């Protein structure tokens, strides 16, 4: 079971590396890692389990965050209360194959399980993306995402490219927003 102590923090060089593509069929080790990362997200979103194990809630966890430099991220974006998740999958070798010109940012900024401090500011992202990835069975998927799920996937893909969310924040004026950028509440 992945715990907070297993998640590496900013300053660890693995977080700044470009992760290696994953080959199929998955090794037993990679299959276990995928399952463990998704279990962490499920546990982190369950208030009882999260409190018991002192887990910070997360909607995404990339392999580099557990010190494994591979192109694999678990994503679990919850749906409205009592409904199925909006997005739940382990995305392997993901690629954004198209995106909107329209940018968006979360009003409250972004956070990260590998960053133990608040970094205020807007993180400009594409509002809509088309994502191609493989699941744990090697099946290719092409999905269109917008708003929050699109932002989550871009954050996770950044981890696979050695980029942290605060790299995107305007250093001079963290809350500067182009007129046409959507601010998502």
Curated annotation (Swiss-Prot):
Its cofactor is Fe(2+). Its EC number is 3.5.1.88. Belongs to the polypeptide deformylase family. Fe cation binds at residues 112, 155, 159. It comes from the Bacteria. It catalyses: N-terminal N-formyl-L-methionyl-[peptide] + H2O = N-terminal L-methionyl-[peptide] + formate. The keyword Magnesium does not apply. SUPFAM superfamilies: Peptide deformylase (SSF56420). It is an enzyme of class 3 (hydrolase). One of its GO terms (biological process) is co-translational protein modification. GO terms for molecular function: metal ion binding; peptide deformylase activity. This is Peptide deformylase. Removes the formyl group from the N-terminal Met of newly synthesized proteins. Requires at least a dipeptide for an efficient rate of reaction. N-terminal L-methionine is a prerequisite for activity but the enzyme has broad specificity at other positions. CDD domains: Pep_deformylase (cd00487). The active site is at residue 156. InterPro entries: Peptide_deformylase, Peptide_deformylase_sf. It comes from Latilactobacillus sakei subsp. sakei (strain 23K) (Lactobacillus sakei subsp. sakei). Keywords: Hydrolase, Iron, Metal-binding, Protein biosynthesis. The gene is def. PANTHER family: PEPTIDE DEFORMYLASE, PEPTIDE DEFORMYLASE 2. Pfam families: Pep_deformylase. HAMAP family: Pep_deformylase. NCBIfam families: pept_deformyl. Binds 1 Fe(2+) ion.
């Amino acid at each position: 079971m992945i715990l907070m102590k297993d998640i590496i923090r900013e300053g660890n060089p693995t977080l700044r590396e470009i992760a290696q593509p994953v080959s199929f069929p998955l090794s037993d080790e990679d299959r276990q890692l995928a399952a463990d990362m998704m279990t962490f997200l499920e546990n982190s979103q369950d208030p009882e389990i999260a409190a018991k194990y002192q887990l910070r809630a997360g909607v995404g966890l990339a392999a580099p965050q557990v010190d494994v430099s591979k192109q694999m991220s678990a994503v679990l974006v919850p749906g409205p209360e009592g409904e199925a998740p909006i997005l739940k999958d382990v995305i392997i070798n993901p690629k954004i194959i198209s995106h909107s010109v329209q940018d968006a940012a979360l009003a409250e900024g972004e956070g990260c399980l590998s960053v133990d401090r608040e970094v205020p500011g807007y993180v400009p992202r594409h509002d809509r993306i088309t994502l191609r990835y493989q699941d744990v069975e090697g099946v290719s998927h092409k999905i269109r995402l917008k708003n929050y799920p699109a932002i989550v996937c871009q954050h996770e893909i950044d981890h696979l490219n050695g980029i942290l969310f605060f790299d995107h924040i305007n250093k001079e004026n963290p809350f500067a927003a182009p007129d046409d950028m959507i601010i998502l509440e």
